[in-house]
Amino acid sequence: MRIFLSLALLFSFSVMAQESTEYKYEVESNKAEYYIGSYKEGKDLEDLTAWYGKFAEWADSKGSTFDKMSVAILTPYFSSDLSTHDVMWVTNTPGPLEQFTGLQEWVTDGLPKLGKSLPVINTQVLDTWQWVVSSPTTTEEGTLMYATYADCSLEDGYNMRQVYDMYKDFAGFAQSQGDTLGRKLIVVESGGQLDEGVDFVRLMYSSSVMERGTNAALYYDKIEGSEASNNLKGFSCSNASSYIGQSMRDYK
């Protein structure tokens, strides 16, 4: 999967419907930054985890600035090309105010102090909006997460807001049957470009590796073929890549 989307697809791309159109749900969104890179020679995940300890100590020294930031370190596992990168460092914040307040602290103080000791060389950094469809059981610190990103295309006659509403309906039914997957629709504000014909990226993630299997079994047993499943339309996804990693920091 070529990781994520083009600048042209920001929020406005999904508000292509007429202003008078009424939708069932208000979009719940958050900002996320993806730092995608490879380890420096002789370095590995253990070194990055140790470096995170320095970062966390620095972040905690900044008062409440980073209280609303989560951090996860994800390693590619199922992928068509594992040579493209070793790791993704993912931060989430509720919105741009929290994101850019923290970013200013990082570039003016944190980066000069910690940048040289970072054991990773980043080859791509993405600034994204994520539309929250459903949430997993937990994202608390220490959670071993399983996350799958897939390229998705809209079908003719559908826009992102329509798809979001249908996906929310589906997720609500799935949760009533015991589903615990988190789901997000991702668009990039800057830093990435999608292949032609790809409109957004879908993230599906669970609070443990085993939980992903439990949810897959539940889908085939109780959800596939249901009215809610049949009503989920307007897009298709392919070219998925899966990651395993740990939640290092959750919202306070």
Where are these regions (language model features)?
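Positively charged n-region of N-terminal signal peptides that target proteins for export
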Residues: M1-F4
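Hydrophobic h-region of N-terminal signal peptides that target proteins for export
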Residues: A8-A17
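Short S/T/G/P-rich N-terminal loop/turn motif that feeds into the first structured element of a domain
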Residues: A17-K113, L118-K252
